[in-house]
Amino acid sequence: MHLRIHARRSPPRRPAWTLGIWFLFWGCIVSSVWSSSNVASSSSTSSSPGSHSQHEHHFHGSKHHSVPISIYRSPVSLRGGHAGATYIFGKSGGLILYTWPANDRPSTRSDRLAVGFSTTVKDGILVRIDSAPGLGDFLQLHIEQGKIGVVFNIGTVDISIKEERTPVNDGKYHVVRFTRNGGNATLQVDNWPVNEHYPTGRQLTIFNTQAQIAIGGKDKGRLFQGQLSGLYYDGLKVLNMAAENNPNIKINGSVRLVGEVPSILGTTQTTSMPPEMSTTVMETTTTMATTTTRKNRSTASIQPTSDDLVSSAECSSDDEDFVECEPSTGGELVIPLLVEDPLATPPIATRAPSITLPPTFRPLLTIIETTKDSLSMTSEAGLPCLSDQGSDGCDDDGLVISGYGSGETFDSNLPPTDDEDFYTTFSLVTDKSLSTSIFEGGYKAHAPKWESKDFRPNKVSETSRTTTTSLSPELIRFTASSSSGMVPKLPAGKMNNRDLKPQPDIVLLPLPTAYELDSTKLKSPLITSPMFRNVPTANPTEPGIRRVPGASEVIRESSSTTGMVVGIVAAAALCILILLYAMYKYRNRDEGSYQVDETRNYISNSAQSNGTLMKEKQQSSKSGHKKQKNKDREYYV
């Protein structure tokens, strides 16, 4: 008796689980791409403009910091809708501190910094940008021995660039522009020649994980005293943000905002400019002015024992004293930058700020200050007409202040102001009463050719109007004669900020971007800010090789790192699922079906047990089942 078991393998079922694995594989790829695109799109809304960056590393001691990929930001963030804010730093020092959120700290390969300032101090820090603690990267704009300079470190050694030609602590308003691209840098003050620096050797290029911007130098013990206006750094207008009470900004010490629009001027009609006509810096220069001869007016000279220089009045006493003055002889020159410590100020300021000068500074100047009996002069003088308020009572001449430190002028809008509202002004903008009998047909302001068509000229009253202008040094040195038979007196630099005050609506022309006026085709990848005009951009190339200026690159470290981690985790999880599914299908695969055939064969006689007969039986069995040898297997029991 033997059992016959037929083993038949069923057809393979591979296509079912193979399709499942393929489905999971493509799902893994699609999910990874989707997660990466979501992270990139969410990061691009808050990152700054930049171009492609290479994968670079900084080595600070034993720490190794990897730099993620760069994120693009719209160039629109470089523009604003109004002029830059202005802050006065008193003699006791102050600090404006902006701190980036912990998850939004940028790393940059190139930087742009610009600010307007005026001061008389010989040493002080204007702006300093520091990286996160432990990294040591920084960028600092400072005045040393009266000269402006920048020092920065991005991982190797301190690199410095300085304007050696002329001191900038002369009390005049200056605009400084700094660009960095890798280790190369440029520095320009006003329209002076550009200083360039190309360090030798291999330099690291990334300013890692920027954490805070400190303005004023109080945290480093090098106090800045004077005025700062329209600070711009890589798309951030920090002073504007401070004026808007940004939660990431803290203000300490003797710091005062000027240029606010008070509630009493809430009904004043102003003009709004498009973003293309906005800028962040307002520049003033020492100017000439005519004054109305009045009774009870006198001049007061600076006492040699005092270091304070009062700038914006016609009498030496405070306006609250109501002290009448004797007539002045005219011809006085006043330095336009003067501030004071703003500790106790009245609700409506009646006095301009003053600044403490060095003990060795004894200017032989006379100062004139306005008392309240001079307020009638404002109504007589009038104000420049707004371009959108019609042309009644106005002529064709209008004078405004240039946005660059070279004395350029152009037409703009200047809303009417109240003589009492000092805090609506930028404290260093000088206002003058220009008689049309003297300046008839003259001093017509001209804007640069590429931007002159954006403005309509203001008009001045036939009698006289209070206007603002910046004149050449030759005109500043002019002194009026006291003879009654000559033209009216023109005392130089009368600082009366209360008669006419520039408003935040005064908008200066920005620099042309990479799009030219007559064409919308992009000529170069250069991204400019309103204060960078014709400033060469230093590129991180080999020494002596200079390329076309590149765009600022800002890398959002936290968002890109998060996206990378999410993508890796998702891919790893999907791969593990695929592996588990494959193992499950392998262990539970179909081994085939088996059929057992039981038959009984009885031995009829004992002779069949002989070996010969057994062989014949086996041969006959093989021949009988020859067709089924591949299907059936016989097992003898």
From Swiss-Prot:
List cellular component terms (GO): cell projection; plasma membrane; presynaptic membrane; trans-synaptic protein complex
Domain called Laminin G-like: residue spans? 85-255
- Look up the signal peptide feature and give its range: 1-35
> What are the subcellular locations of this protein?
Presynaptic cell membrane
PTM note says: Processed by alpha-secretase leading to the formation of an extracellular soluble protein as well as a C-terminal membrane-embedded fragment (CTF). Proteolysis of these CTFs by gamma-secretase releases intracellular domains (ICDs) and extracellular peptides. O-glycosylated; contains heparan sulfate. Heparan sulfate attachment is required for synapse development by mediating interactions with neuroligins.
Name the membrane topology term. Answer: Single-pass type I membrane protein
Q: In which tissues is it expressed?
A: Expressed in the blood vessel walls (at protein level).
| SUPFAM superfamilies linked | Concanavalin A-like lectins/glucanases
Task: Just give the chief location class.
Answer: membrane
State which ranges are Cytoplasmic (membrane side).
584-637
PROSITE patterns xref list = LAM_G_DOMAIN
Q: Name one GO molecular function term.
A: neuroligin family protein binding
Keyword Phosphoprotein annotated: no
Which InterPro entries does this chain map to? ConA-like_dom_sf, Laminin_G, Neurexin-like, Neurexin-related_CASP, Syndecan/Neurexin_dom
Q: Which residues are glycosylated?
A: N184, N252, N296, S312
Q: Where is the composition biased (Basic residues)?
A: 55-65
Q: In which family does this protein belong, per the annotation? A: Belongs to the neurexin family.
Q: How does it assemble?
A: Weakly interacts with CBLN1 and CBLN2. Very weak binding, if any, to CBLN4. Specific isoforms bind neuroligins NLGN1, NLGN2 and NLGN3. Interacts with CLSTN3.
Stated role? Neuronal cell surface protein that may be involved in cell recognition and cell adhesion. May mediate intracellular signaling. Functions as part of a trans-synaptic complex by binding to cerebellins and postsynaptic GRID1. This interaction helps regulate the activity of NMDA and AMPA receptors at hippocampal synapses without affecting synapse formation. NRXN3B-CBLN2-GRID1 complex transduce presynaptic signals into postsynaptic AMPAR response.
Give the protein name, as stated in the record. Answer: Neurexin-3-beta
Gene name, Swiss-Prot/TrEMBL: NRXN3
